[in-house]
Amino acid sequence: MHQVISATTNPAKIQAILQAFEEIFGEGSCHITPVAVESGVPEQPFGSEETRAGARNRVDNARRLHPQADFWVAIEAGIDDDATFSWVVIDNGVQRGEARSATLPLPAVILDRVRQGEALGPVMSQYTGIDEIGRKEGAIGVFTAGKLTRSSVYYQAVILALSPFHNAVYR
């Protein structure tokens, strides 16, 4: 059984990690241990590079806390080009897989507040009345009318980031 350290305690992210690992390695093939670690970037990262750095930092910090795990996984959400997206970073001590998620364009009323220094999650919670929306369906669930959720979009990115770990051509 793979010991997987999730560099987050966010249920939406943990669900995506678990589903993706089970899809690739088989049901019941992994045990997820969530840990809260620092990203080293602002609460609301802007731009692809800052967001990717946050995910990389989280993986590195989780690895320092739990060096005996098989995998360390981080999902860092950010804002870039008027849209929200995330970077997924997965490390197994030998190689690293990284993937960027799909992007969701955000309406100006939301972006204006985020650009003024507020994080997307709290802004969306105020806009929708859904407490801790970032730990649930997220802006993605709201603006796609539930057709996608934060977790479902992250799931795809985790699957992509796992590609180097089960395809020999990457080695």
Curated annotation (Swiss-Prot):
Subunit annotation: Homodimer.
One protein family per Pfam: NTPase_I-T
MF terms (GO), sorted A to Z: ITPase activity; metal ion binding; nucleotide binding; ribonucleoside triphosphate phosphatase activity
UniProt EC number: 3.6.1.73
GO biological process, one term: thiamine metabolic process
Transmembrane spans: none
Stated name of the protein: Inosine/xanthosine triphosphatase
Origin species: Salmonella typhimurium (strain LT2 / SGSC1412 / ATCC 700720)
Catalytic activity as recorded in UniProt: XTP + H2O = XDP + phosphate + H(+); ITP + H2O = IDP + phosphate + H(+)
Cystine residue pairs: none
